UniProtKB/Swiss-Prot annotation:
<keyword id="KW-0833">Ubl conjugation pathway</keyword>
<keyword id="KW-0808">Transferase</keyword>
<dbReference type="GO" id="GO:0016567">
    <property type="term" value="P:protein ubiquitination"/>
</dbReference>
<keyword id="KW-0067">ATP-binding</keyword>
<dbReference type="GO" id="GO:0005524">
    <property type="term" value="F:ATP binding"/>
</dbReference>
<keyword id="KW-0547">Nucleotide-binding</keyword>
<comment type="pathway">
    <text>Protein modification; protein ubiquitination.</text>
</comment>
<dbReference type="InterPro" id="IPR000608">
    <property type="entry name" value="UBQ-conjugat_E2_core"/>
</dbReference>
<dbReference type="GO" id="GO:0061631">
    <property type="term" value="F:ubiquitin conjugating enzyme activity"/>
</dbReference>
<feature type="active site" description="Glycyl thioester intermediate">
    <location>
        <position position="143"/>
    </location>
</feature>
<feature type="domain" description="UBC core">
    <location>
        <begin position="57"/>
        <end position="217"/>
    </location>
</feature>
<comment type="similarity">
    <text>Belongs to the ubiquitin-conjugating enzyme family.</text>
</comment>
<dbReference type="InterPro" id="IPR016135">
    <property type="entry name" value="UBQ-conjugating_enzyme/RWD"/>
</dbReference>
<protein>
    <recommendedName>
        <fullName>Putative ubiquitin-conjugating enzyme E2 39</fullName>
        <ecNumber>2.3.2.23</ecNumber>
    </recommendedName>
</protein>
<dbReference type="Pfam" id="PF00179">
    <property type="entry name" value="UQ_con"/>
</dbReference>
<comment type="function">
    <text>Accepts the ubiquitin from the E1 complex and catalyzes its covalent attachment to other proteins.</text>
</comment>
Amino acid sequence: MVEIKDSSNVRKLKEEFLRDFKRFDTVEDFSDHHYAAEGSPAKLSLWHLKFKGRPKNWVKDIQKEWKILDKNLPETIFVRACESRIDLLRAVIIGAEGTPYHDGLFFFDIQFPDTYPSVPPKVHYHSGGLRINPNLYKCGKVCLSLISTWTGKKREKWLPKESTMLQLLVSIQALILNEKPYYNEPGYEKSMGTPLGESYSKDYSENVFVFSLKTMHFEEFVRSHFFVRSHDIVKACNAYKDGAPVGSIDKGGVKKQTRQRGSLKFRINVTSFMKTVVDEFVNLGAIREANHRGEPNPTLFSCFFFCYLELIICSV
């Protein structure tokens, strides 16, 4: 069993840091931003923008967005803007409970185009080379009707006089990082509720959680987040190893009583990758490792061996 290290003072400091961490703030530099090289090579400061020929109210529109974000961001979304490049934003979204993304951190780089708000913002997802959602590509593309990268009804698309950056970020969290992302794939929603569809959905969600375990002006926030959430993540992994279905865990334990069980492949993947997760938490000073689960589960061990053997055979 993985135990939590008795470091109440450190944990308290981390919790206080997260509590005081501003949901919206400005930074001095965005040189590592995905869109940093786009636009004018000159710094897009408020002073420079007066001479760049952009729409008259472009600066005011962006400043208005800043104010909306500053006042209305939910507890699970954090945004950083840059005063020297006011066209750029960076956001981190915390995966919601009840989804395969729970406790994960998902980063997005955003740019206000020169013709904003007549056109929607550009959004790039930092995927780490992993496909964790039908709407989030490995290359960083985000498919969402609100930003015109996917089809949608009129009210689902960007409306220059109504749509906001806050709406965009909340939409990514609610519509993309949702409970059953499998059905985000076009056409798959027709199988929702059917035995085959639910089976595929469960497999997809299990893979999403494992990928999320593998994943910028938020460095201290990230360290503190995972320090504080380490107990919940380890508890979830232990429950998943025992067969709990993915997304059924909250801070109080298994919240959904169901006959469904996590697949054997999922349990094996979590068991295998948990060593890496635990090592990172140990390095972070959040936990100490006594034993992942006492004696190894013979069923899991034997199945893991045969899966590994099959992988070797297929690769020859």
